Design a protein with these regions (language model features):
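Short, basic interhelical loop/turn and adjoining N-cap
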Residues: 46-57, 108-121, 194-195, 224-242
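Dynamic "connector" segments at or just before major functional cores
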Residues: 15-22, 27, 135-303, 310-330, ...
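Short, Lys/Arg-enriched anionic-surface-contact patches
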Residues: 3-27, 72-85, 190-197
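Short, basic alpha-helical/linker "hinge" immediately adjacent to a nucleic-acid-recognition surface
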Residues: 41-42, 46-47, 51-92, 117, ...
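A short, amphipathic alpha-helix used for macromolecular contacts
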Residues: 80-113
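Short amphipathic alpha-helical "interface-anchor" segments enriched in bulky aromatics
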Residues: 219, 455-490, 495, 499, ...
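An anionic, glycine-rich sequence signature occurring as long contiguous blocks
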Residues: 149, 155, 368, 373-478, ...
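Short, amphipathic alpha-helical "recognition" segments used to contact nucleic acids or chromatin
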Residues: 23-39, 85-98, 202-210
Length: 579
């Protein structure tokens, strides 16, 4: 609404009051005209560009005391006691050539502490200029402690006793030996360096996963800890550059060989059955703008954004992760189900008994290829308007009532319509189709499968358990920082997701040794056991790990933790004690 100014001002400068520019000033003049000068609400509102209702609302707020037009200034303190107390010392140190950082550090140890901002203000007030950058030797002490170099552990020079924050990390060694980690590394063909064996490299990276270090670049949190180094058979862990560049020496084929050997060991240890396997994709978001990365749908952001697409497989019976791949692209992602089936056939000599996955994982053409190979699948069918309408048109007698099991020992009553010869658009044969209502959705859930032997109830309950793989991925994010992208190069992420599978398998094996923890999640194991501190006692020919007393120490005393021989310790024995 246009603003109508009052008559021309009597004196110069009066236009400031006739045509106020600021919102608060305009509101003040409008209220003054209405409340003091006696203009009607309509006249005052028109003069200053308000609607009548807006002006009356402003008047109501003013009368209620909710409008302050003139704020009294509140001057701040005229002196800075802390600066004044430290001024003489700051001037003395600055004249001696010390930097602002060094002066602040020195004052922090005195009775007149002052932060860097205060020191900088004093230097500016006293006319001191900026110091040129000086050689490190002239700038005072080092900012960070020099960490020990990574090398193979020399047990002859190790101290007789050392304190560690992660003594609990060594609880994972018996299960790593049961899986025969050195043989897995050899099967993968992972390279060694002049100083560090391949097994120690992998154990160094695994240690970060098991204790919940979010990124490889945070390795310095553990780099000087003797427990973490001993876990890997080293005098000290490799540092950031060595660990982050190790993946550049690898290729996807090596990860496949490692997973094949790991899956064999997992099956032999009874950690998986391989009969029914859940499959799913997971996009790991990239926070930069790398144009080389494709855009994928990221559930956490509810949008498509640049990310690295990963693929996981989980044993449906034991919930152990079996497979991971980050070497994917949009053009090839639909074929990943077949790639996993071939991997499993190569590893075990047979195809999986049943593959369970979401409708977005693959295409109908790939489903036909699975059927050609005799691989059974169970997946969702997308609901089209035509299909939904046809289901709504079915008579009540076409639906069969069933009671299906739910998590936690509960049950649910559902209605099912089964079509044993349903047709798909791009699938050359018929499939068995189950339309299910009563699962908490507005529209029927439609399952399709080429399995004509399992009962309807068994198929519905089996697909309901597919959500377990999403729980495993949530555990990997929470415990192993799966969503902390290892880099913009998928090759880096490929090794990282394989390490997450290995860490998950180790935790699955460890919890079997702990009474009452058969279903514990990895983050629970980390918090209660793997993060336990303690002491490492070197007896020359064997090592004793004495774990500190904690609330959960009784569980460890009852656990199956045998004395074992560790190959990467020069075949020395490992023995556990509890304080």
């Amino acid at each position: 609404m246009s603003q109508t100014a009052r008559s021309a001002p009597v004196r110069a400068g009066g236009e400031f009051f006739a045509a106020p520019a600021e919102a608060a000033h305009r509101r003040y003049e409008a209220l003054r005209a209405y409340l003091y000068e006696g203009l009607s609400a309509a006249e005052a509102a028109q003069r200053f560009g308000y609607t009548t209702a807006s002006l009356l609302s402003a008047a109501r707020d003013f009368r209620a005391g909710r409008r302050d037009f003139f704020v009294q200034p509140r001057p701040g303190p005229k002196s800075a006691p802390a600066k004044q107390a430290a001024r003489a010392k700051v001037i003395e140190l600055r004249r001696a050539g010390h930097s602002i950082y060094e002066i602040a550090e020195d004052l922090a140890r005195s009775d007149t502490p002052l932060n860097r901002t205060g020191v900088a203000e004093i230097c500016a007030e006293e006319g001191f200029g900026r110091l040129w950058t000086r050689p490190a030797a002239e700038r005072g002490g080092p900012r960070r402690e020099t960490l020990p170099r990574a090398d193979v552990a020399d047990f002859a020079t190790l101290p007789a006793q050392a304190e560690t924050r992660v003594a609990g990390l060594l609880l994972a060694i018996p299960d790593l030996l049961q899986l025969d980690l050195p043989a897995l590394v050899h099967a993968a063909g992972y390279p060694s360096t002049a100083k560090i064996p391949a097994t120690s490299y992998l154990l160094s990276l695994l240690a970060l996963k098991l204790v919940g270090i979010r990124r490889v670049s945070h390795v310095e949190d553990l780099a000087a800890d003797p427990g973490a180094a001993l876990f890997a058979g080293l005098a000290a862990l490799p540092k950031t550059t060595a660990l982050t560049t190790y993946s550049y020496r690898l290729e996807h084929r090596k990860q496949l060989h490692f997973l094949a050997a790991l899956d064999k060991a997992t099956l032999a240890a009874g950690l998986a059955t391989g009969d029914e396997i859940n499959l799913d994709f997971h996009a790991v978001m990239h926070w930069g703008q790398d144009p080389a990365l494709e855009k994928h749908y990221v559930p956490r952001r509810s949008q498509r954004t640049r990310s690295v697409l990963t693929f996981f497989a989980e044993d449906a019976d034991t919930h152990t992760l079996l497979y991971a791949n980050a070497d994917l692209a949009k053009a090839t992602q639909a074929g990943e189900v077949l790639a996993f089936a071939d991997h499993w056939n190569t590893t075990t000599g047979r195809y999986p008994g049943l593959l369970i996955f979401d409708s977005k994982v693959t295409t109908q053409a790939q489903l036909a290829e699975l059927d050609d190979r005799g691989i059974r699948f169970l997946t969702l069918r997308a609901r089209s308007p035509k299909l939904t309408a046809s289901l709504h048109a079915l008579p009540a007698k076409a639906w069969t009532a069933l009671t299906v099991a739910r998590a936690g020992g509960k049950t649910r009553r559902v209605q099912v319509h089964e079509d044993s010869a349903a047709r798909l658009t791009a699938y050359p044969r018929t499939v068995r189709q189950l339309a299910v209502t009563g699962l908490g959705h507005d529209e029927p859930t439609i399952l399709i499968t080429n399995d004509h032997d399992r009962t309807t109830k068994a198929l519905i309950e089996t697909y309901a358990q597919r959500m377990n793989i999403e729980q495993r991925l949530a555990e990997a994010i929470r415990s192993f920082s799966l969503d902390a992208l290892a880099g913009a190069v998928p090759l880096n992420v490929d090794l990282d997701v394989v390490l997450s599978v290995l860490a998950h398998t180790v935790c699955a094996a460890l919890r079997r040794r702990l009474p009452g923890y058969a279903t514990a999640t990895p983050d629970t194991l980390q918090r209660r056991f793997l993060h336990t501190g303690g002491h490492i006692i070197n007896h020359s020919n064997h090592i004793t790990v004495r774990l500190d007393r904690r609330a959960y120490s009784p569980v460890l005393r009852q656990a199956d933790l045998p004395t074992i021989t560790v190959p990467w310790w020069g075949h020395r024995q490992l023995h556990y004690e509890f304080a």
